[in-house]
Amino acid sequence: MLAATCNKIGSPSPSPSSISDNSSSFGKGFHPWKRATASSCSLGSSLSSFTRNGGGLSDSFGTNTSTGSSAFSLTSGTSSNSHFGNDYSVFQTSVSNNSQEPSHQPMFISKVHTSVDSLQSIYPRMSVAHPYESWFKSSHPGIPTGDVGTTGASAWWDVGAGWIDVQNPNGAALQTSLHSGGLQTSLHSPLGGYNSDYSSLSHSAFSTSASPHLLTTGQHLMDGFKPVLSSYPDSSPSPLGGAGGSMLTGGPTASLAGSPRSSARRYSGRATCDCPNCQEAERLGPAGASLRRKGLHSCHIPGCGKVYGKTSHLKAHLRWHTGERPFVCNWLFCGKRFTRSDELQRHLRTHTGEKRFACPVCNKRFMRSDHLSKHVKTHSAGGSSGSGSGASGGKRGSDTDSEHSVPGSPSCHSPDLLQAPESVPTTGMNGRASSLD
């Protein structure tokens, strides 16, 4: 369709000889693009001539017969080489050396093609299947025009076996492919200059398989996260066999995981322990059955020697030696830390003012259970103590309660509890008086 339109436009065009170079008037006309006979044009373009000679300006869409095909060309005087030749090599037009007219510099590309046959004659290296292949490749200065279309019908958007194939002018290629297969887009672009920079990414950065040189550092980093102490074969944890046990001994502790006799001590209903008594009983084997029955767990710190009946108590005791306080008070602006959970619960009562321990006789309440037990002893005192002992007992109970109470805590002394100590000695005195009578 384009060729037919061009033929229609080119038929009524006037002769190029009608325009004189020395004429002062403007001669305008359209002339079809014709291939040069005197000069060789491998990738020529149709350009128009704006010539300025002497006192006349010729603004015409004509061609100079001596310089071959030229459209939109600008007279440049004595310059015979285009300064756009390196960047726009596809638009260059070969000019005869023996031409009398000034050389013309190509500026614009012509989009008028007479026929498909003329494409092959004008662009002999370009395939008809992809008419824009030469324009794309030649627009890049790094790729010579001689390499255009050397692969025949293959174009720059063809799909191959790899992922990216960037070719440089020297023929070296950077291939970064996915091993799973897929697209390969041969990009003939200036990225070929980065071949040396990205050559190390070949078959590594985009590969689905593990690359040895990339995973070497990661494997060394993961080695630091391996468990330092091997666990026991069974699921029962050791209360002292963790990092705290090795930190307390000051030397290498006996590893129970690798010893063959460690399985003899693994029976249900018994928690594992690394205290000196348990280690001695395990060393003796069957002869240490008496030590196991006692169930005594001693502290291994030299100079301490405290003995506990439960491993949990020994574990809490060892925190005093290590300074570990894992239980933190979450009250606002407090943040105190404690070695035992019951100590933390007792401390929280100082913030809330709760007195959860009540006397069964006088209904007096206390924050701590040991304070309540001391108060109960005042009610169970002997008859020889008399009323004075009862009054002094009530006084000691109130002193003990107020001593361990936090000043300023809410509901620390309620009115109904303050009257309770006065009624208790009265009932006690009346009861004792009636019994004596």
From Swiss-Prot:
Motif (9aaTAD) on chain: 154-162
Source organism superkingdom: Eukaryota
UniProt key word Mitochondrion: no
Biased composition (Polar residues): 424-437
Biased composition (Gly residues): 383-395
Residue intervals of every C2H2-type zinc finger in the record: 297-321, 327-351, 357-379
Stored SMART domains: ZnF_C2H2
SUPFAM superfamilies linked to this entry: beta-beta-alpha zinc fingers
Keywords attached to this entry: DNA-binding, Metal-binding, Nucleus, Repeat, Transcription, Transcription regulation, Zinc, Zinc-finger
Pfam family, one: zf-C2H2
Region (Disordered): 1-24, 232-263, 373-437
One GO location term (cellular component): nucleus
Zinc among keywords: yes
Biological process per Gene Ontology, one example term: regulation of transcription by RNA polymerase II
Cellular compartments annotated: Nucleus
Similarity-based family: Belongs to the Sp1 C2H2-type zinc-finger protein family.
Protein role: Transcription factor which plays a key role in limb development. Positively regulates FGF8 expression in the apical ectodermal ridge (AER) and contributes to limb outgrowth in embryos.
Entry remark concerning the domains of this protein: The 9aaTAD motif is a transactivation domain present in a large number of yeast and animal transcription factors.
Protein name: Transcription factor Sp8
